[in-house]
Each structure stands twice: as C-alpha cells, then as structure tokens.
From Swiss-Prot:
Record protein name field: Apolipoprotein C-I
Keyword Acyltransferase: no
Species this protein is from: Oryctolagus cuniculus
Stated family: Belongs to the apolipoprotein C1 family.
Localization, UniProt: Secreted
BP GO annotations: lipid transport; lipoprotein metabolic process
Record-linked InterPro entries: ApoC-1_sf (IPR043081), ApoC-I (IPR006781)
Superkingdom assignment: Eukaryota
Length: 28
C-alpha cells in the first residue's frame, strides 16, 4: 500500500523548494 503520510508531505516540500528558489532569485 502507498504511504499516504509521505504523499501528504510532498506539497509542503514543493512549497519550501519554491520559496527557496524565489529567495535566491530575489538576492541574485
């Protein structure tokens, strides 16, 4: 069976990744 707790965490990781990219883009 798939691990739904991991699937639920994926959107948060994507949001964190997007925020990090935005911050780096602003600093550049």
């Amino acid at each position: 069976a798939p691990d739904f707790s991991t699937l639920e965490l994926i959107p948060d990781k994507l949001k964190e990744f997007g925020n990090t990219l935005e911050e780096k883009a602003r600093m550049a």
